[in-house]
Amino acid sequence: MAVKVGINGFGRIGRNVFRAAVKNPDIEVVAVNDLTANADGLAHLLKYDSVHGRLDAEVVVNDGVSVNGKEIIVKAERNPENLAWGEIGVDIVVESTGRFTKREDAAKHLEAGAKKVIISAPAKVENITVVMGVNQDKYDADAHHVISNASCTTICLAAFARVLHQIFGEVSRMMTTAHSYTNIQRILDAATHADLRGARAAAESIIDTTNGAAMAVALVLPELKGKLNGMAMRVATANVSVVDLVYELAKEVTVEEVNAALKAIAEGELKGILAYSIEPLVIRNYNGSTVSSTIDILSTMVIDGAMVKVVSWYDNETGYSHRVVALAAYINAKGL
């Protein structure tokens, strides 16, 4: 039976989670809460997306929004505790406003009647951070009620970092992500951003900024704690990002050995989560990719036998949203 989901925050991730859910028979979105638009506006942005194109579904506005004949309740409530999720049958809330990332704040959805909350962002003092394909076996249905789905960069990195660690071992790693701009940035220069680099026009610069994804990997792979760090370069593209990971191994390897290990896991245990490409593709070719991470096989490098570079692409909206939906289905399967 499909789990009933409510989405709090219908921005880039909220809408992409909905799009992913439409294709998944194990998920039924029954309600959306968002302060920024009425039902007409929400339906329009759901149906027509500047990055991902038109939604292949019938979207109709009535008292709420109907998608493929199923009614979606639309709310505009500022306080999560007032959303009455229980009264409308919501089992799991996807918290995608970016505002309620602390456990005590996200837990207000539980007070409103939801059984579980998935935060679509790195969280603070959450019950657990889960990356599908990496540590979902650590989830405890009885103990974990506020769950973080980590970040898009973390799920990309963790998908192949675990493989490399288990097979080859390492001394240390350094990561850089070239990340498409997001709504937290500015279209034009504005002094309202706490980070002066982040205050600059998103489409006019490559913007050096911090990124917690590397250290956050240790939340799902504790064995990498203190062995991984990194940064981000925000670039002038609307979607899709790429991780460049350089790491020092404890033993010598070849490019062929590294690629063979990654191919094997992508075709086996992590199929649908980790993929690889042997073609000379560019950023636009990965738009719409539903996996967490796609290894660019042609870009793998080895120097002096033990210094290795691996490059992996990820659709930071679509891939991430599909992992949110997969996590919701997994939680439901484990019992609410």
From Swiss-Prot:
GO terms for molecular function: glyceraldehyde-3-phosphate dehydrogenase (NAD+) (phosphorylating) activity; NAD binding; NADP binding. It comes from the Bacteria. GO terms for cellular component: cytoplasm. Its main location: cytoplasm. It is found in: Cytoplasm. Gene3D superfamilies: Dihydrodipicolinate Reductase, domain 2, NAD(P)-binding Rossmann-like Domain. Its EC number is 1.2.1.12. Keywords: Cytoplasm, Glycolysis, NAD, Nucleotide-binding, Oxidoreductase. D-glyceraldehyde 3-phosphate binds at S151, C152, T153, T182, N211, G212, R234. Pathway: Carbohydrate degradation; glycolysis; pyruvate from D-glyceraldehyde 3-phosphate: step 1/5. InterPro entries: GlycerAld/Erythrose_P_DH (IPR020831), GlycerAld_3-P_DH_AS (IPR020830), GlycerAld_3-P_DH_cat (IPR020829), GlycerAld_3-P_DH_NAD(P)-bd (IPR020828), Glyceraldehyde-3-P_DH_1 (IPR006424), NAD(P)-bd_dom_sf (IPR036291). This is Glyceraldehyde-3-phosphate dehydrogenase. It comes from Heyndrickxia coagulans.
